[in-house]
Every structure is written in structure tokens, then in C-alpha cells.
């Protein structure tokens, strides 16, 4: 199982608009291998947050990252909200409860 964690800093004061765009862009898309996805706002920095997704395999996650949906719909819609600080981590899940 693979976890994809993206941390980003949004342009000041744009969280609500970003959250609406995220929900509108992500909802209803059937993505092979995707087990679940979460969007979390930092409680100490309202302009910072995390997108976390859980995948069956590394290959499924990589296929998503290379897909037309990701490159042509999701990224172009969400990227303009970021203030330049944006990092994605890809993790092999070692423990689950």
C-alpha cells in the first residue's frame, strides 16, 4: 500500500476557494487503485495544508500522476492557488491499524 502526501502553502486567504475547487475537481472521478483521499488544513497555519491519498500499488499511483485527468484537469485547476511552496512525498505504508 502506498501513501501520497502533498504539503503546500496557498496564497494568503485563498483556502476556502481552494477547498471548493479541490472538491469540484476531485469528486466523482473513478481512479484505478485509489483507496481513499483526504484534504487537511493546518490548524496552526490556515494557508497551509495536506492532500493525502492511499493507493493499492506504486504503479497505480504513478499511473494517476501521469494520467490526462491529473495533468490536464486537476493540476491546472489547483496549481494556481499555491504560493510556490509545494512538496509531494510518496511513502510505502508499513503499519496500519
Predicted regions and their residues:
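Short S/T/G/P-rich N-terminal loop/turn motif that feeds into the first structured element of a domain
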Residues: 1-50, 54-69, 76, 80-97
Amino acid at each position: 500500500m502506498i501513501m501520497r502526501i502533498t504539503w503546500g502553502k496557498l496564497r494568503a486567504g485563498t483556502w476556502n476557494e481552494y477547498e471548493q475547487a479541490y472538491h469540484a475537481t476531485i469528486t466523482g472521478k473513478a481512479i484505478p487503485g485509489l483507496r481513499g483521499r483526504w484534504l487537511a488544513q493546518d490548524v496552526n497555519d490556515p494557508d497551509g495544508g495536506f492532500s493525502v491519498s492511499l493507493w493499492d500499488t506504486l504503479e497505480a499511483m504513478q499511473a494517476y500522476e501521469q494520467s490526462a485527468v491529473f495533468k490536464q484537469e486537476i493540476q491546472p485547476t489547483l496549481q494556481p492557488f499555491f504560493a510556490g511552496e509545494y512538496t509531494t512525498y510518496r511513502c510505502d505504508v508499513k503499519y496500519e491499524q
